[in-house]
Each structure stands twice: as structure tokens, then as C-alpha cells.
A protein has these predicted regions:
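A glycine-rich helix N-cap at a beta->alpha junction
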Residues: 130-143
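Conserved P-loop NTPase nucleotide-binding/switch module
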Residues: 160-204, 211-221
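Loop/turn-to-beta-strand initiation segments
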Residues: 105-107, 132, 157-160, 204-211
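A conditional alpha-helix N-cap/helix-loop micro-motif detector
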Residues: 56-60, 89, 142, 184, ...
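Short amphipathic alpha-helices and their capping/turn segments at secondary-structure boundaries
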Residues: 145-161, 198-199
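The Walker A/P-loop phosphate-binding site
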Residues: 17-132, 148-154
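N-terminal acidic, proline/glycine-rich, low-complexity intrinsically disordered segments
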Residues: 1-12
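Short acidic loop-to-helix transition motifs that present clustered carboxylates
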Residues: 115-116, 140-145, 217
Length: 221
């Protein structure tokens, strides 16, 4: 047998071996899937999503292009961050305006932890503060804020939630105790507990959650 035919035979043999291994792997995967579906439910394996996902425009074509999907994807958590005075709240306001336009049957929830939201400035940008679909709240603590978000997201009536801002948030424990390293660490703990709990409800309700944050030179709140 010529060298060429030997190589062809080896290639065919290798392909057959690979196909056999793949078939074996598929059988193993099928068995695992059946067991997981039986224990965790059929929804544990979701369909692959290809293409543009439902989103909300930020009002900036450049930012939307960089993000992809024409803006902030519904059902996910996003963060707008930057230095002081870098138009973070302005960008969030433009996003709220577009959410009201793109999803007229849904509400937008804005949580003003800083207690500094300028209603007149937002009006000049094009947001109607008197629109009944625009919900404006000023929670006193992080825990109150997340409880509000959890309850309202579960209704399925929101397209967008904006929490402004992370540095201005304060936990109940911080409100009641003296400022020290232990109480300062309470905010990150509350955030790390609360955000994961919202991931599935946000996905089911098709609601985008936006946190506004600030770049700091020191790792403190």
C-alpha cells in the first residue's frame, strides 16, 4: 500500500474514532440532562439566543453601538460609572426617556438615594416628571430600596429601574451605628446579598436594572 493510501486510511480511522467518541459523549450528556430536568425542572436548559436582544437605547448612538444590542439589554443588571460631573445621571435620564417611549405599556422606577435629582433639568432633557409611568422614590436605606425593587419587579410592570447612586446608599446598620470599619463594610455585604436575588426576577420580568456608581481613588464608601 502506498504512503498516500496509508495516510488516507489513518485519517478515516481517526474520523471514525472521533465520531464514536462524540456519540458516546452525546449519550452521556443526554443522561445528565434527563436527570437534571427531573430534579430541577425543564427550564434549567434554556434556548440559545442569537441576534439582537430587547433593549433600551441610552440616547447616544455611539454608546449604544459600543454596548451592542442597541442599548441596555432588558432582564439584566447594568452599571453607569464615572468621575463626579461626568453626566452619569444625565445618561440615565435619557435612558429612562427612551424606556418610556420604547415600552409605553411599562413603568420606569427611579430611586434617588442622593436626594439630588433635578426634576426641572430632567424636564429640559425631555422627561415628563408628571408622567404616571415615571415612578420617583427616595428610599432611606439600601434594604428599603431593594425591597421596593423586588416587589415591583415581581409585578412585571417595569421596563427599567435606576438606582442613583451606590455611594449615596446607606444600610440600616450604618444609620444606627457609629462609623467604623465594620459598619462601612455593611453596604458591600447588603449589595452582594441583594443583587443575586434579583437576577432571576429581572430576567422573568424583562426589566433592566441600572446602578449609577462613581469612580473613587480610595477603596471606601
Amino acid at each position: 500500500m502506498s504512503t498516500k493510501k496509508v495516510k488516507e486510511a489513518e485519517a478515516v480511522s481517526e474520523e471514525v474514532t472521533q465520531q464514536s467518541k462524540l456519540a458516546e459523549a452525546k449519550r452521556a450528556l443526554s443522561g445528565v440532562k434527563m436527570a437534571l430536568k427531573k430534579k430541577l425542572g425543564d427550564d434549567i436548559f434554556t434556548e440559545k439566543v442569537i441576534g439582537i436582544l430587547p433593549s433600551i437605547s441610552t440616547g447616544s448612538a455611539l454608546i449604544d453601538k459600543e454596548i451592542g444590542n442597541n442599548g441596555l439589554v432588558l432582564g439584566r443588571v447594568h452599571e453607569i460609572f464615572g468621575n463626579t460631573g461626568s453626566a452619569k445621571t444625565t445618561l440615565a435620564t435619557l435612558t429612562m426617556i427612551n424606556a418610556l417611549k420604547q415600552y409605553p405599556d411599562k413603568f420606569v422606577l427611579y430611586m434617588d438615594f442622593e436626594q439630588a435629582f433635578n426634576l426641572e433639568y430632567s424636564r429640559r432633557l425631555g422627561l415628563d416628571p408628571d408622567d404616571e409611568r415615571f415612578i420617583f422614590m427616595q428610599p432611606s436605606s439600601i434594604e428599603d430600596g431593594f425591597e421596593i425593587v423586588d416587589r415591583m419587579v415581581s409585578t412585571g410592570i417595569l421596563s427599567l429601574v435606576v438606582m442613583d447612586s451606590v455611594p449615596a446608599m446607606i444600610s440600616r446598620r450604618e444609620m444606627e451605628a457609629d462609623y467604623d470599619k465594620e459598619t462601612m463594610a455593611e453596604k458591600p455585604r447588603v449589595l452582594s446579598r441583594s443583587i443575586p436575588k434579583l437576577l432571576e426576577p429581572l430576567k422573568e420580568a424583562n426589566t433592566a436594572l441600572v446602578f449609577i456608581n462613581q469612580i473613587r481613588d480610595k477603596l471606601s464608601y
